[in-house]
Each structure stands twice: as structure tokens, then as C-alpha cells.
Amino acid sequence: MQRTQHVKRTLSQRFALAALPLAVAATLAPLPAQAATNWVPTRTTAFLLSNAPAAAASTASQAQPAYSLNSVGTPALADTHVTPLELSQPLHVTVVLKHRNTDQLDAFLHDVNQPGSASYHKYLTPAQFKARFAPTDAQVAAVVAHLKANGFSNISVSANNTLVSADGNAGNAQNGFQASIKRFNYRGKPVFANDSAALIPASLGSIVDSVLGLQNAAVPHRLLHRFAPAAAIEPNRISKNATAASQQVGHQPTDFAKIYDASGLPAATNTTVGIITWGDMTQTIADLNTFTQNAGLATVNTAVVAGGSGTLADDGDPGEWDLDSQDIIGTSGGVKQLIFYSAVNGDSSDSGLTDATLTDAYNKAVTDNKATVINVSLGLDETAANSDGSLAADDAVFKQAVAQGQVFSVSAGDAGVYQWSTSPQGAPGYIGTYNGTSVRTTINLSKYSVSSPASSPYVVAVGGTTLSTTGTTTWAGETVWNEGVAYADLDSNGNPVDNAVRIWATGGGVSAFEAAPSWQTAALGSTVTKRVVPDVAFDAAQSTGAYIVINGQTNQLVGGTSLASPIFVGGWARVESANNNSLGLPTSAFYQNFPTNTSLLHDVTSGNNGYSSHGYTAKAGWDDDTGFGSLDFAKVSASSAK
């Protein structure tokens, strides 16, 4: 669930009233002249788009030009004042460097998971990957020198040489990347974004791929769904697709191992699992300890690893990380170690959370190479991720994970086919307004999008179902998760703050940017040229979700694809433990084996993930709602051992 952040307005003492004229003058300074250096583009394009021709303002009172964001539909910014970001405003940037020998890397990634190949399941160590495919030390040194020359400090280089992070300010970014940055209010909080592309000197053109950290207007949001009775408007009438004796009820996290036939496998005590998070994990670990004590499970060996330098602040909302950790442990029966790879968020309002800090966290999980399976219950519109460069940057991280035999599992999203559309307070899946009697749609219902990083070909994308059981632990049926329409923007008590409405449904569909991997085209047909998601799906409905501990309070019923991915991670950790942590990214095997071995699956054939006859409709076999469906983990494990 995306929640509104209540941002504290704090001003540094250096912006005291006496210094205000100087600060204003600094923000209006022109971009440095480019004559001395030949500048070339990176993948990081302008995130803030002007809808008016560039023209010098003749008076201070001249109206501001209209702006839009560089995401699907280029949503216009309304009722907000767009001004230059003060040049002294601190920024944390991450420069993403290009891999070397990319053709060889792509060939290796194909072969390492291809039975019969000489490289089959012969994974690389981080040192081996660095030697063969990472940027050279000389290339890194050139980037570091450029950052230093433009005033950046606290420069750090990732262990795999692919990320160079640094602290500076908007003025340093303007000098170093020719990047103009604006500030404005969006989704109820003050944010910033670049309104020009990030450029680099031509001498770095073959080295640098993108520059992250130039915007914090669009970052991945949490994908959990908590019950709010006042929010319901048009709930879908869901067919149980099961026997008359079945029911749709909430579950303890330990129930899912039985429901999906993982409980017969040994607990995943030979496997280390990671979770991508942000901020402080103190409350999350306390809640996890309460859960394991109540469930009769062993206390979990946990660790918190910061994705980069900076503050891991408590933002007061541990629900997402509680859902992830408790359902992974409940489904897995226990793990060797649970590592929280936490992105720097800066403060209690998450104002320091950017595309840069999240990519840093993904990369830290890969360079550590300790976690076999890594959960990501986060997502955002993939057009936004492509615009700022993080889509390609994250793909590069996930490629190294595949080469090392690590598995990233990513939630497919909770906004159905409308990941791109957001409410006034930033909730995805926005479709229109409610006047008390009927819904008035205000978007193009035929425009679809998918969530990043779930759309990456180098991860397992996990969609959502509505689960029916006999009792609470015997699988009886699943349909596509689609709860219909609800109020989008809620206060802390779960009451609507405006008349905006959204859908709650599993993400799924066709990527606009990611090419279909060969194994997907081979299984689904030559017409599939772009990556389609999800690959598999598990329980996500709030009504059939998990009872977890949040802020010390037990029996909090939560759903979303943030539940579905941890169920897969917990079950897959058992499969990995039973197979010596040797299976690697399983998607190519899924697409090779599942079409002809349906006994390994629970096929989902009913429901859709849109609104008012839009979206994708489930069918026999693979579909854009639930992929191949949910797994019978014991049968998949036995098949994997052959």
C-alpha cells in the first residue's frame, strides 16, 4: 500500500532570512557553458517535462509554464508551483557504469541455466564476475576524477565497480551533469526532479550508463494491502472456483507451506534469504521475534546491511517489512540467515529515498553474494524507471545475480493494468472519482502498463490470486486477485480524504521496454517479443491474506502481491535447501517444463486484472494475470532434482 508521507518542513540554518537574497540569486544562475567540453547523453532523461516553449521570463510575476512527468501518459502537474532547486540543496547521486563484454555476458546468462550447456549451473563468484564483465579500475578512476573535479565528496565505489556514489548538491549536479533540477509538490509532499537530461563529458561516454539520484518524485512504493472497511466501494464478486466446502479466510503465515505443499520439504535452514527494504529495521525485527515466538518457530538469525552511506531512519510504518519477513519465515519454516538489505531513506519522511539508494541496496545484496533468494515487494511504473535510468541500472544488477546463482523475486504490483495511473495522493491504480452513488472514470481504461522491477527478464515476477481453502491449510482453488474499486487516498484511520478511487488487483501484462527472453518466446510463441509478466502467482487478496504482527499488534490481516512474493520466496528457499542452493534463476526451467507438466501447478483460469471489461482475462495455461499459476513446491522440488 502506498501511504501518504507527512513531511516535516525543515530549513537549514544556512537558509536563514538574512541569506535569502544570495540563495535566490544562486538558484537563478545559468547552466555552465558547454563550450569547453563535448557533452554526450546518458540513459537518464529529463524527468520533469515542460509543456511550454522555453522563453525568458520578462517579469517575476510571469506565469510558470505547465509541467508533466516523464512516465506513462505524461501526467501533468496541477496546482503546484515549480521553481529551481537551490544550488546548495544536498544530493546523493549514483553514477552507473556499463558492463564490459556484454555479448559474452548475455551468452553466459543463457548457458548457465541451460541443461546440457558446459556452463550449466557453474555460477561465478563476485570476483570472477568482476574480472570478466565489470568496469575496469581505470574506468572507475575516470568517473571518480570527474566527480571530484565538480565538487562531489564522500565518493564510494561498489565492490563490483559498477556504481560510484557521491554526496554533493544541486550545483555540483549542474556542473557535473549539466542537469537543471526543479522543486515542486507532488503526491502531497515536496519533491525534486531534473528537467533536463543528465550529460557527461564525451571522454566518459563509453563508461557511464546513467546518473541516479536526480529525482525523488517517483520511487518504488510498497505493495501491501491492509483492510480498510470505509474504503470499499465496488467489491468484485469473486467466484471461488472450488468445492462448496471451501472458504476464503485469512491465514497464519505458517499455513502457506501446507497450502502450497512445501511443508513436506525440510525447512530452509541451509539457505540465506535477503529482503530489500528501506530505513530502520528495529521494529520489524522485534515484530518478527514476536511472530516466531507465537508460532513456535526458532528465533531468526537476522542482519541489517545498509545499501549505502547515510541514515536508516524509522518512518513509523514497518508493515511491508513485517509482511515480507514473517511470511518468508512462516512459509520456509526457518532460514540460515535473514538479511535486510536496507536502502538509505534519510529521515522519518523518507525524503532521502531515491532511485539511487534503492539501486545501491539491490547491488549490495549481489556483491555480498550471501543470500540465495532475495525478496522485493516494491514497484513503480516502468516508464518512470526507464526515464530516470534505473530500469537499465537494476537490470545490470540482476544480471550479476543470475550469473552468481541468486534469485530475485519481485511483486508484480497491486494496481492491475493501471500501474501508471496515480491518485492525487500518489496511490497507483487510480481510475476516477466516486460521487456517492457511482464511479466516474477519468482515465483511458485501455491504456495499460506493468511494474518495474518485476518486468525485468532477470527476476521472477510474482502475481496475485484470491485463495480458497478447505479449512485453513488445504488448497481448494484460486482466481485472479481483483478486489474491485475502493477509495484511493485514506487517512491514518482508513477513512477517505477525497473522492479518488482505485482498483486493487494483481499486476500483469506486457513490458514497453524489456525484450522477451528467449525462453519466454519459445514457450509462448513468436508473437511474444516483449517481456510479459507475471511468471507465477500466489495468494494476495486481503480477505484471504496473512495474519501478521505490526508494531507489536498481532492478527493484522494483510494482502497484496507483497504477500505473494514472500510466499514464493519462502517456498523456493525450501526447494533451494533441498537442492544444495544450486538451482539459480528458475524462470527458464519454468517455461520449458510447465507447459507439458501441469501437475506441478495450480492453473488459474478465472478472473481478470482490469476494470469494466478491461484488462487481461485468465485462461488455461500461461496468462497475463497469474502466469502459470501457483506451484506445488514438493513436486517442483522433485522435478528440479532430476
Label for each model-derived stretch:
Residues M1-A36:
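Gram-negative bacterial Sec-dependent N-terminal signal peptides
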Residues S12, G509-V510, G570:
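Glycine-centered structural positions embedded in regular secondary structure
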Residues Y458, G463-G494, A500-V501, A505-G507, ...:
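Active-site-proximal C-terminal subdomain of hydrolase catalytic domains
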Residues N38-A159, S165, A170-A461, S492-P496, ...:
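Substrate-binding/charge-relay-adjacent region of secreted/lumenal peptidase catalytic domains
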Residues A16-L17, I155-S156, Q400, S613-H614:
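Short hydrophobic/aromatic segments of transmembrane alpha-helices and their interfaces
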Residues L28, T422, T472, V569, ...:
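N-terminal low-complexity, intrinsically disordered patches enriched in charged
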